[in-house]
């Protein structure tokens, strides 16, 4: 298929189906907390290294089932999809979400973090940023990162533990793999080096 060829051109591996294994591996990503359904799984899985970083891309589907309030009407199913582009980093970090208004609203309500304001009015107008660690949010959303994100299409970003993820509310769009991988790789490069320095242990 075209997606197989796209993965091959990037030197990456493709697997059509991996069950729920990747969702379990990345269960800490909050997007999974709003998923419920009678059937779930990871499809169109692409893995490997891109610009020196381990990366994983996949579509996650789940099926919801509704019973009719009328005895004579059949039940119906709805197939829902998210797609993830994940870069695995060498250090763990606090949870941080950067997204357009409404995209992660259910997550925000569950987590309860307040919006973080930035000096850049354009950035604050475009994105809702939430984290329990405000200092880390400012370190990540430094001036170069803000300039870069303002120059990109609106993205939905979640960073937690070792995963830097782009999240989309539909299946992966063919032909966008390379550009999405370049985005997560660029964001990783714009993170200050000191964030990856070993933290001194408490006495």
Predicted regions and their residues:
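Charged, low-complexity intrinsically disordered regions
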Residues: 3-203
